[in-house]
């Protein structure tokens, strides 16, 4: 096999639909658009959600709630990721420097995923019940604030 002989698998690629190339193609003359009307013209499509002048559904329904900007900056950290860190005293800054959480993270929470085999101390980081039990079983502790 050489680079110049590589081909896609048989039947994996279909030929492009060529329109306006004669009656025999089945897509000649009007190119599958039918006769006249807005949809047959170039640029003849209305915007998404347009209902012909009727008040659109997205404007008829009331607005509700909002998208929290801080929700995306709350990060989950696995227990197995903490086990790989070289330090025993772990806070949010340590996690950022190690690249475990992104630099714009506002808070972190440890979840029970994997195991921990050494004593660590968490400072200012939340932990689930399972993660807390695993950390304490390994001789570690969680200090709030």
Swiss-Prot record:
Taxonomy, superkingdom: Bacteria
Start-end of Gly residues biased regions: 21-31
Region feature (Disordered): 1-43
Disulfide bond entries: none
An individual GO BP term: translation
Any Pfam family: Ribosomal_L27A
Keyword rRNA-binding in record: yes
GO cellular component: cytosolic large ribosomal subunit
Keyword Kinase in annotation: no
GO molecular function, one term: structural constituent of ribosome
InterPro entries with a match to the protein in the record: Ribosomal_uL15 (IPR030878), Ribosomal_uL15/eL18 (IPR021131), Ribosomal_uL15/eL18_sf (IPR036227), Ribosomal_uL15_bac-type (IPR005749), Ribosomal_uL15_CS (IPR001196)
Swiss-Prot/TrEMBL keywords: Ribonucleoprotein, Ribosomal protein, RNA-binding, rRNA-binding
Family named by the database record: Belongs to the universal ribosomal protein uL15 family.
Task of the protein: Binds to the 23S rRNA.
Subunit (UniProt): Part of the 50S ribosomal subunit.
Protein name per UniProt: Large ribosomal subunit protein uL15
Organism expressing this protein natively: Aromatoleum aromaticum (strain DSM 19018 / LMG 30748 / EbN1)
Gene name of the encoded protein: rplO
């Amino acid at each position: 096999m050489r680079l110049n002989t590589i081909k896609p698998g048989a039947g994996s690629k279909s030929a492009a639909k060529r329109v306006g190339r004669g009656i025999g193609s089945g897509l000649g003359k009007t190119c599958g658009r039918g006769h006249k009307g807005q949809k047959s013209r170039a640029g003849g499509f209305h915007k998404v959600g347009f209902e012909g002048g009727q008040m659109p559904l997205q404007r008829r329904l009331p607005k509700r709630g909002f998208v929290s900007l801080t929700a995306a900056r709350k990060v989950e950290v696995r227990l197995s990721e903490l086990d790989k860190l070289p330090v025993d005293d772990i806070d949010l800054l340590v996690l950022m420097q190690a690249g475990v959480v992104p630099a714009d993270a506002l808070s972190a929470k440890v979840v029970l995923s994997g195991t921990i085999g050494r004593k660590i101390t968490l400072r200012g980081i939340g932990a689930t019940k399972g993660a807390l039990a695993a950390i304490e079983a390994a001789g570690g502790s969680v200090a709030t604030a």
